Swiss-Prot record:
Region described as Involved in apical transport and lipid raft association: 11-33
Protein name, per record: Neuraminidase
Reaction catalyzed: Hydrolysis of alpha-(2->3)-, alpha-(2->6)-, alpha-(2->8)- glycosidic linkages of terminal sialic acid residues in oligosaccharides, glycoproteins, glycolipids, colominic acid and synthetic substrates
Disulfide bonds: 92-417, 124-129, 183-230, 232-237, 278-291, 280-289, 318-337, 421-447
Residues the record lists as binding substrate: 118, 152, 276-277, 292, 371
Catalytic residues (UniProt): 151, 406
Stretches of the chain found on the membrane's Intravirion side: 1-6
Cofactor dependency: Ca(2+)
Residue ranges annotated as Virion surface topological domain: 30-469
InterPro entries: Glyco_hydro_34, Sialidase_Influenza_A/B, Sialidase_sf
Stated regulation of activity: Inhibited by the neuraminidase inhibitors zanamivir (Relenza) and oseltamivir (Tamiflu). These drugs interfere with the release of progeny virus from infected cells and are effective against all influenza strains. Resistance to neuraminidase inhibitors is quite rare.
């Protein structure tokens, strides 16, 4: 082979190799582009349909990295669809309540910077529970804590922490409020925050961290709300608000809110005479509330809220073992399901109850005269039969030698049912303990259980003599 032929042969082989490399690069590029655009589709194995990801709201991006012949391909995995809560599962069948959480805020205040609070409550998003309370704009070991027995000052704010985390100095102040309610619709938190002058207060509606709507006082007499969670079904949340006398006729209205915007307001109707501080729970497709009659009755009023047509009905818990404080002795207390019992109706305390078929589960102070001790039990026929008094499944939560306070309900959705939980406010300081100048609280939380359980007492536990004055 002469030199020219060698040159031609080498050139041909080189050209062939170059062409092959070029074609391989094109194939790799085509594969990369195909896999890159494939991330915009989610295949559903059940019926082999392909659903675009574009309309799905993505809360967070999850990146999966796959290595193919030194080529890095980033593939975005389609997240789950974020949906409104509808609470359509049945209510869990329970045998009683088991301990869940306790924050020990007062004991910790003896040696740490913990907020002065009252009116606590608990509410949960779809994955986690949070505790709320109305702060007094001060920590306990602070001269500003003097006089915090007062309910309404412009420095009060709504505090929010993960359940079990005391309200330390790093706690988020959600809004300005001396009365509040909060709930999660499945997508974001709604906070109802009341503040301002007694005769001209404002309720702000904060959704997903933004102020969306507001409403002013309609009776010019301390606009106020639940001091526990509101309830959202299919994106519409409902909250009960009252404006008017605390010991006489008042104007109660039920507000319906969608993504922070008031969409409807219904007046109270039915036989309830006075409504304060409702404890509400989902009863799909509607909402039910058990409240405080601060005027005529020690039996608790009930509000049934129709979420479809905004209609309202009200009555009273049928149980003759009544839930408010003060109240008559159990042997002489009564309820006819429809009217206030006119037995020591004033002043009262926030509380809760919920229906279980014809029965009722309820909690109340052990003392019939003061906010001390706390017990729960089920009353057979207590939701359907007037003056029923057959009690079962009684539990002591706080013994009668220790102070309690407000209590309220919150609901938690499990895989198969809706569980009911409750919290108890454990008030310390004034007016009962005059050695100190402050008033504050801790909380204890229990949830329904279908299992067995023991006994105990879970008071606040702080030695008042160890506390800052």
């Amino acid at each position: 082979m002469n030199p020219n032929q060698k040159i031609i042969t080498i050139g041909s082989v080189s050209l062939t190799i170059a062409t092959a490399c070029f074609l391989m690069q094109i194939a790799i590029l085509a594969t990369t582009v195909t896999l890159h655009f494939k991330q915009n589709e989610c295949s559903i194995p059940a019926n082999n349909q392909v659903v675009p990801c574009e309309p799905i709201v993505i809360e967070r991006n999850i990146t999966e990295i796959v290595y193919l012949n030194n080529t890095t391909i980033e593939k975005e995995i389609c997240p789950e669809v974020v949906e409104y809560r509808n609470w359509s599962k049945p209510q869990c069948q329970i045998t009683g309540f088991a301990p869940f959480s306790k924050d020990n805020s007062i004991r910790l205040s003896a040696g740490g910077d913990i907020w002065v609070t009252r009116e606590p409550y608990v509410s949960c998003d779809p994955s986690k529970c949070y505790q709320f309370a109305l702060g007094q704009g001060t920590t306990l070991d602070n001269k500003h804590s003097n006089g915090t027995i007062h309910d309404r000052i412009p420095h009060r704010t709504l505090l929010m922490n993960e359940l079990g985390v005391p309200f330390h100095l790093g706690t988020k102040q959600v809004c300005i409020a001396w009365s509040s309610s909060s709930c999660h619709d499945g997508k974001a938190w709604l906070h109802v925050c009341v503040t301002g002058d007694d005769r001209n207060a404002t309720a702000s509606f904060i959704y997903d961290g933004m102020l969306v709507d507001s409403i002013g006082s309609w009776s010019q007499n301390i606009l106020r709300t639940q001091e526990s969670e509101c309830v959202c079904i299919n994106g519409t949340c409902t909250v009960v608000m009252t404006d008017g006398s605390a010991s006489g006729r008042a104007d109660t209205r039920i507000l319906f809110i969608r993504e922070g915007k008031i969409v409807h307001i219904s007046p109270l109707s039915g036989s309830a005479q006075h409504i304060e501080e409702c404890s509400c729970y989902p009863r799909y497709p509607n909402v039910r509330c058990v409240c405080r009659d601060n005027w005529k009755g020690s039996n608790r009023p009930v509000i049934d809220i129709n979420m479809a047509d905004y209609s309202i009905d009200s009555s009273y818990v049928c149980s003759g073992l009544v839930g408010d404080t003060p109240r008559n002795d159990d042997s002489s207390s009564s309820s006819n399901c429809r009217d206030p019992n006119n037995e020591r109706g004033n002043p009262g305390v926030k509380g809760w109850a919920f229906d279980n078929g014809n029965d009722v589960w309820m909690g109340r102070t052990i003392s019939k005269d003061s906010r001390s001790g706390y017990e729960t039990f089920r009353v057979i026929g207590g939701w359907a039969t007037a003056n029923s008094k057959s009690q079962t499944n009684r539990q002591v939560i706080v013994d009668n030698n220790n102070w309690s306070g407000y209590s309220g309900i919150f609901s938690v959705e499990s895989k198969s049912c809706i569980n009911r939980c409750f919290y108890v406010e454990l008030i310390r300081g004034r007016p009962q303990e005059t050695r100190v100048w402050w008033t504050s609280n801790s909380i204890v939380v229990f949830c329904g259980t279908s299992g067995t359980y023991g006994t105990g007492s879970w008071p606040d536990g702080a030695n008042i003599n160890f506390m800052p004055i």
